[in-house]
Design a protein with these regions (language model features):
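C-terminal-biased regions
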Residues: 2-191
Length: 191
């Protein structure tokens, strides 16, 4: 009996770098005052959307620094805040982008999305075991597990997708009338 053994192909590891619950929580805690202010203060929210739509990074940084004293390492397209990590030349980034890219943010749609993600961010900031489970799902690239952890905290009929990506996650919302897709992300970037 000469049975041929099938050659086992090596399991391809995902390209994610491992992110820790501490890095995730620190990033979320740094942006949480900003998102709270967007929800709490209509004038601040309108000023923010105006700065984003006119690509006024100086005004965006000024507005962010009014509510969070966290140092910003990057402000990118759409908008994003990059925070240093212990990993050399790596930032953990949180922000939004809009698809199609040439679209303009509206105060109302932006507010709806921020209100939807706020419960998730509050939980990540305050619940270490939850942040640990989310981080484990991110590090393993397990989008199904990540969905089951996050989806119950985001109560919005506009929620489109939740994905593990780049040692972080992307949460997308679609507004049917405008056909715009707002994507909130927290992921590892280059600094």
């Amino acid at each position: 009996m000469n049975k041929k053994r099938k050659r086992q192909l090596p399991v391809r590891k995902q390209q994610n770098e491992f992110i820790t619950p501490a890095i995730l929580r620190r990033t979320i805690r740094n942006v949480l005052p900003f998102y709270r202010e967007i929800v709490r203060n209509p004038a601040y929210s309108a000023a923010w959307v105006q700065a984003v739509n006119t690509i006024d990074f100086v005004q965006m940084e000024r507005l962010f620094q009014k509510v969070s004293h966290a140092p910003i390492a990057e402000l990118g397209s759409g908008y994003s805040f990059g925070f240093r990590t212990p990993m050399r030349d790596r930032l953990y980034v949180n922000g939004f982008f809009l698809d199609p890219a040439q679209s303009k943010y509206t105060v109302g749609e932006h507010l709806v999305v921020v209100q939807a993600i706020l419960p998730l961010y509050l939980r990540l900031a305050t619940d270490i075991p939850f942040a640990t489970r989310v981080t484990a799902a991110i590090n393993s690239g397990n989008t199904t597990r990540l969905n089951s952890l996050i989806r119950g905290l985001i109560r919005s009929r506009f929620l489109l997708t939740i994905r593990a990506q780049d040692s972080g996650f992307r949460i997308s919302f679609r507004f049917p009338i405008s056909r715009k897709i707002y994507t909130n992300y927290t992921l590892l970037g280059v600094g």
